[in-house]
Amino acid sequence: MITRLKNWPRLLKTPLQIARHSIQQFSHLAGHYERPPQSGKSSRDPYLVTVVQGRSKKPRFPGERANQRFGEDSWFVRSTPLAEVMGVADGVGGWRDVGVDAGRFAKELMTCCSGQTQRSGFDGRSPRNLLIASFQELTHREHPVVGSSTACLATMHRKDCTLYTANLGDSGFLVVRNGRVLHRSVEQTHDFNTPYQLTVPPEDRKECYYCDKPEMAVSTRHSLLPGDLVLLATDGLFDNMPESMLLKILNGLKERGERDLLQCASQVVEKARELSLNATFQSPFAIKARQHNVSYSGGGKPDDITLILASVEVQSA
């Protein structure tokens, strides 16, 4: 009998994978984000109008939005003199089974990323280096937070109006221009529903967990134009909403002010939430399950959803 998939290992290796490792050892909805003023910007430089929306799979605790979390997802948005920076992370849910808050690691990783953008010399041209430095900061703490998460970072360097990205796992991003997808990130997975992930494992069981390196994040670079849309999201969006449906909502944007972007982002999140609870909808997740010969009756995948939506703008003359 085929039943809906409730839990799939996103976290632990199989016994065979553990053996191979041993052999290879030696080898609720958010309000919009208001960008704080920064010195050093030229009034003619491109900038991003950015909003954040999200929805927890189920209520976690009061005030989680203010804590930059939606369930086990986390996010950050920062503006520096040279760049606009944003990121999302999805805490791997398998940690719940061993009594660990699966979202805490994601939150701490995003906090480190946000803090690293304020360091001297940060110019936004290498989000992968930002991810590497942030993960090192996290792991070098006296008492590191145990857990793992995916990560997707994007920066827009203002002077050259260029988007730089680093993506590890199955969160991701889209660049949309004139109603069409200019670029979409590619998932990195070990197996079905088992993404690449940054991990701080328990000391006594390191060999049992996937421990991918931030250097494995895929980096891309894209020249942007005024009017382009940049979207970052966790897999709660991409697993439930087909690209065509997402584009239909995004293409309904007539204006690019914060209020308009916020309404658009709300529509996307609410539609993804609706589809995640639809047991008959042939979601992207259901299609992937079938491609991997995984028993799954179809329908959406209930999950936390986090979305950052940004529009490239320039000051009018």
Curated annotation (Swiss-Prot):
Residues 46-312 form the PPM-type phosphatase domain. The keyword Cell wall biogenesis/degradation does not apply. Its EC number is 3.1.3.16. Belongs to the PP2C family. PANTHER family: PROTEIN PHOSPHATASE 2C, PROTEIN PHOSPHATASE PTC7 HOMOLOG. Signal peptide: none annotated. InterPro entries: PPM-type-like_dom_sf, PPM-type_phosphatase-like_dom, PPTC7. GO terms for cellular component: mitochondrion. Coiled coil: none annotated. GO terms for biological process: dephosphorylation. The keyword S-adenosyl-L-methionine does not apply. It catalyses: O-phospho-L-seryl-[protein] + H2O = L-seryl-[protein] + phosphate; O-phospho-L-threonyl-[protein] + H2O = L-threonyl-[protein] + phosphate. Mn(2+) 1 binds at residues 90-91. This is Protein phosphatase PTC7 homolog fig. Mn(2+) 2 binds at residues 90, 235. GO terms for molecular function: metal ion binding; protein serine/threonine phosphatase activity.
